[in-house]
Amino acid sequence: RAANKKVQLIYAFNGTGKTRLSREFKELIAPKAEGEEAQASDLAAKKILYYSAFTEDLFYWDNDLGLDAEPKLRIQPNSFTKWVLEEQGKDQSIAATFQHYTSEKLTPHFSPDFSTVSFSFERGNNQQEPHIKISKGEESNFIWSVFNALLEQLISELNIVEADSRSTDAFNNMEYVFIDDPVSSLDENHLIELAVNLAGLIKSSQSDLKFIVTTHSPLFYNVLFNELNSKVCYLLERFDDGGFALTEKHGDSNKSFSYHLHLKQTIEQAIADNKVERFHFTLLRNLYEKTASFLGHPKWAELLPDDKQLYLARIINFTSHSTLSNEAV
């Protein structure tokens, strides 16, 4: 908060507290009044717009499917979706964004009062499979599409300098946008595209609005870093004794931020300390996969020496229990 920068971009592994950080920052900027429900009060009073796991909690499936009930994604009453859907009518824009990142055949249908969403899949020849339950990844993409529509409108309104000239006063008190990991299930092409589009939105902001973006994806981080023309970054390290070090880095993030080097260092340290554990094999496999992808090999096992290939491949496959090339560690 004290840094007073337009954009702060943060990378951290899963499980290190990015979502907790978003919550703590929200409480710092706008402490919740006693008895107030999260994101349920008047939108005009908000100082921070945030996307995180807590945002996704506003959407939940109606699991009461007795009597052949149709699966619906319910939306808890809140000021953000009420404004973007009921007052601004952005449902078609949301549907278009969602289809862009998933499939043009997968269509969301809002109820007239915007309290529920159902989904259908177009199979061609005018055949439709109605009322399907989408995957968790598709659900996350849908929720991001809702947030994206709100973010576009927020930036557009605040770019109007004179508050009296804005079409709404709903965002006049807004100071921060906190975005936590909007990349849960995108392939690399769409991941890059989302990062480029988000960077473009951020750069289009001409007001005093400040942005904080956190992610566990090295690719998403690097694309944003480069698109936002960042010049300086900081590496926060935690030591075994509980101490911390914050080191300033300059230049290309690919030189300052090297996930594969961190994996290599972690594995080498475990070997040196004679403390190799099961998860180190998962790290090793992850390192092989990233190297194979960079060198253009279809299978990471092709990197292994011929006399060790079969043995090591079996060992790593057995210990990591995964054939996924994009596994998050």
Tell me the role of every PLM-derived stretch.
Residues R1-V7, T16-E27, I132-L246:
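Switch/communication elements of ASCE P-loop NTPase nucleotide-binding domains
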Residues K203, N222-V329:
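RecA-like P-loop NTPase motor core
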Residues R23-L85:
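ABC ATPase nucleotide-binding domain signature region
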Residues A69-E139, V146-Y176:
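Extended helical coiled-coil dimerization/tether regions that scaffold
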Residues K26, D91-Q99, S103, A195, ...:
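Generic solvent-exposed, charged/amphipathic alpha-helical segments
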Residues I10:
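Hydrophobic anchor at the beta1->P-loop junction of P-loop NTPases
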Residues F13:
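P-loop (Walker A) phosphate-binding loop of NTP-binding proteins
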Residues K5-K6, T16, D42-L43, L106-F110:
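General N-terminal leader/first-domain-start detector
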